[in-house]
Amino acid sequence: MAGEENFKEELRSQDASRNLNQHEVAGHPHSWSLEMLLRRLRAVHTKQDDKFANLLDAVGEFGTFQQRLVALTFIPSIMSAFFMFADHFVFTAQKPYCNTSWILAVGPHLSKAEQLNLTIPQAPNGSFLTCFMYLPVPWNLDSIIQFGLNDTDTCQDGWIYPDAKKRSLINEFDLVCGMETKKDTAQIMFMAGLPIGSLIFRLITDKMGRYPAILLSLLGLIIFGFGTAFMNSFHLYLFFRFGISQSVVGYAISSISLATEWLVGEHRAHAIILGHCFFAVGAVLLTGIAYSLPHWQLLFLVGGILVIPFISYIWILPESPRWLMMKGKVKEAKQVLCYAASVNKKTIPSNLLDELQLPRKKVTRASVLDFCKNRQLCKVTLVMSCVWFTVSYTYFTLSLRMRELGVSVHFRHVVPSIMEVPARLCCIFLLQQIGRKWSLAVTLLQAIIWCLLLLFLPEGEDGLRLKWPRCPATELKSMTILVLMLREFSLAATVTVFFLYTAELLPTVLRATGLGLVSLASVAGAILSLTIISQTPSLLPIFLCCVLAIVAFSLSSLLPETRDQPLSESLNHSSQIRNKVKDMKTKETSSDDV
């Protein structure tokens, strides 16, 4: 308490010395440095009531144990990105033609061009048709060349891909001529697995613990990721992609929960940002491997092999002490904390361990119904669901927009992924200087600006939305790609702030459940994007991006700030902390007036 009084005295002395400047600046009663000092004081007050923060200080805020934990927790994010975006690289193929090898029986020395010219009908523009062929006739080669073939039909013996340099799912299962929608089916199956995985793993994470949820999700990546390489039918491929999506979302929920509950203050923010950087590295790694491998099965084989070393997590990954306490496992929580302290070469004072008891020795219980009963929890869930819906819708809309512009699949992935790393690192500065709430608002505001610019840039190769007399179409197309890249930059920052902010807003007893419920909105956003783009002009999807970003920006103002605040443990913890901070601000204002 003496330290607090000295701290307050320092604040009052600085306030008195700058009293003249305060009156000169209307609407700014404190200078920036004074605001920083006040924020530190509020952090001291709130931290005193957080037993786990004090314990983690004694353990070592970010010692060897925490550094190892962050590395172990987020390195698998590389493989999550690998399997999440793999579909984009296994559905590529050159234009196919009907298999007309029957003519080689009468003309074995025909070149590929001569074979196509004799057996495949042509479109009015001179290109060969993909889905039709001339029916075979019992003639010799000279008669076929002299009289030609006239009777056409659909392909009888499959297709050939004369210009294909790689073996993809398209030429593996002949997904052409009415089967092109199978590609969208694969994407829909992957998206369908996300909400189911969210529901399954939020139960596992909150009921069984963060540690078993992480192990189960990694096991799913090994089984479904490695097994995909051996699928001999497209339906089995869809089933395994469905399983992979559940594992990916399960790992995201459980890993963020574990890292959030082991770290304090800005270390928590830095760890989640680092995890998202690993995710971007995974997307770049996928692009490089997919570019170099000639077969789609090899891609999944390599991915499955890279996940196998994570089996060792069974012996080296710890459980969350916060979750153990919420489940009444005080002894196990103390053991985990003491082990962490020994790794960091620290000693936890016995009085701190003795304070680690449950209030009235009752186990904290919560259910999904609390998201409806608790007003604050309901508000947080709805607002964050709106933000996640906006992010998902915008991501898929812009990805399809890039494809419309004729950008190669490798460029569409590697460049935005590289840009994501500095975007996420910039969040460190934002989160430290302006907090979680305003960081989310700033990134959403950037999204609004870039979407508005897209409304006035060219629609694609067929024409321009507005007349730009001094700019050729190629330059306008380049401008559109640049704006899309900048929008990806803002989107990456929004996702990073979103995950950290959401994890800090939700209480420990329902953190994984809340993350799972919020992630359901991403599926709805993706489905809406795919539906609108396939049925409406290109102007409406971008316009909806602007509208949704404005709505999310407005709703974000309803959320409380979590910077320098302890993690919520129970359903009423957040309201208690806010009341204490409000009382402290009132006392500070009263002392300033005196």
Swiss-Prot record:
Q: What keywords does the record list, in alphabetical order?
A: Cell membrane, Cell projection, Cilium, Flagellum, Glycoprotein, Membrane, Mitochondrion, Mitochondrion inner membrane, Transmembrane, Transmembrane helix, Transport
Supply the Pfam families for this chain: Sugar_tr (PF00083)
Q: Name one GO molecular function term.
A: riboflavin transmembrane transporter activity
Q: Which InterPro entries match?
A: MFS_dom (IPR020846), MFS_sugar_transport-like (IPR005828), MFS_trans_sf (IPR036259)
Tissue distribution is:
Ubiquitous.
A GO cellular component annotation here is: plasma membrane
Transmembrane spans? 71-91, 185-205, 211-231, 236-256, 271-291, 298-318, 380-400, 409-431, 438-458, 489-509, 513-533, 539-559
Q: Where is the signal peptide?
A: none
The residue ranges flagged as biased composition, category Basic and acidic residues, are 580-594
BP GO terms, sorted? flagellated sperm motility; sperm capacitation
Q: Where in the cell is it found?
A: Mitochondrion inner membrane; Cell projection, Cilium, Flagellum membrane
Quote the biased-composition stretches of kind Polar residues, using this chain's numbering: 567-578
Classify the protein's membrane topology as the record does.
Answer: Multi-pass membrane protein
Record annotation: effect of changing residue 388 to A: Strongly reduced riboflavin transport
Cystine bridges: none
Q: Which residue intervals are topologically Cytoplasmic?
A: 1-70, 206-210, 257-270, 319-379, 432-437, 510-512, 560-594
Report the sequence similarity comment from the record. Answer: Belongs to the major facilitator (TC 2.A.1) superfamily. Organic cation transporter (TC 2.A.1.19) family.
Q: What role is this protein assigned? A: Riboflavin transporter localized at the inner mitochondrial membrane of the spermatozoa midpiece, which is required for male fertility. SLC22A14-mediated riboflavin transport is essential for spermatozoa energy generation and motility: riboflavin is the precursor of FMN and FAD, which are coenzymes of many enzymes in the TCA cycle (the citric acid cycle) in mitochondria. Required for sperm motility and normal sperm flagellar structure.
Protein known as: Solute carrier family 22 member 14
Organism of derivation = Homo sapiens (Human)
